[in-house]
């Protein structure tokens, strides 16, 4: 079996829905987890201290707050967030080119002001909770999800962002366009034995990696498993072999 890459760099554990003590316990059970995603629920509940706690455990942090506002507000928010020492932050690509450019610029300025490494800034394209029917009913009846993802990914790339977030269904399409110069972070990952919960456009870890995903965001498949570390190891094995 040939190992294609360091699998620890490919998996981001989503700890949304957990409190700090539960998250720490889960990470103790899964010592090989390198990346952790903090979402809105946990950040609103615990505030920036949760970042300090996880950084104290030597974890890399994807702060997934999905900023979406006018350019000045997004700029100010990204300036402040970048000073927290996180590794990736997310913003909505649909905020527009000016807001995306301002956000990226502010993230560099905020990090520089404290002498910390600037975070990657990634653009959210179309949420994985949308099915095609729901998307066209609620948001855009004239264009497909793929057409919108293409447009929003290009907007992110043109703004100088470091990557985008898309479902595994669109990864191969985007990887063929952007090659290896653009991070493609992929939620909507489920094992064959899992229920899809509130996700619609889903794939297995190995399928998503084979399609060109840079990193996979995985939550319940690990956190809700009877043996979380065993589930993690199985995921590592599935994506490591060629």
Curated annotation (Swiss-Prot):
Pathway(s) the chain acts in: Pyrimidine metabolism; UMP biosynthesis via de novo pathway; UMP from orotate: step 2/2
UniProt keyword list: Decarboxylase, Lyase, Pyrimidine biosynthesis
**What is the name of the protein in this document?**
Orotidine 5'-phosphate decarboxylase
Q: Is Membrane included in the keywords of this UniProt record?
A: no
Quaternary structure, from the entry: Homodimer.
Keyword match Protease: no
Summarize where substrate binds, as residue positions.
16, 37, 64-73, 128, 190, 199, 219-220
* Catalytic residues identified in the record: 66 (proton donor)
Show the coiled coil region(s): none
The protein's matches in PROSITE patterns, at most eight in alphabetical order, are given as: OMPDECASE
Q: Which reaction does it catalyse?
A: orotidine 5'-phosphate + H(+) = UMP + CO2
Tell me the function of this protein: Catalyzes the decarboxylation of orotidine 5'-monophosphate (OMP) to uridine 5'-monophosphate (UMP).
Which NCBIfam families has this protein been placed in? PRK00230.1, pyrF
The protein's Enzyme Commission number: 4.1.1.23
| Taxonomic superkingdom | Bacteria
* UniProt xrefs under InterPro entries: Aldolase_TIM, OMPdecase, OMPdecase_AS, OMPdecase_bac, OMPdeCOase_dom, RibuloseP-bd_barrel
Its BP terms in the Gene Ontology are: 'de novo' pyrimidine nucleobase biosynthetic process; 'de novo' UMP biosynthetic process
Family to which the UniProt record says this protein belongs = Belongs to the OMP decarboxylase family. Type 1 subfamily.
GO cellular component terms, semicolon-separated:
cytosol
**Protein species of origin:** Prochlorococcus marinus (strain MIT 9301)
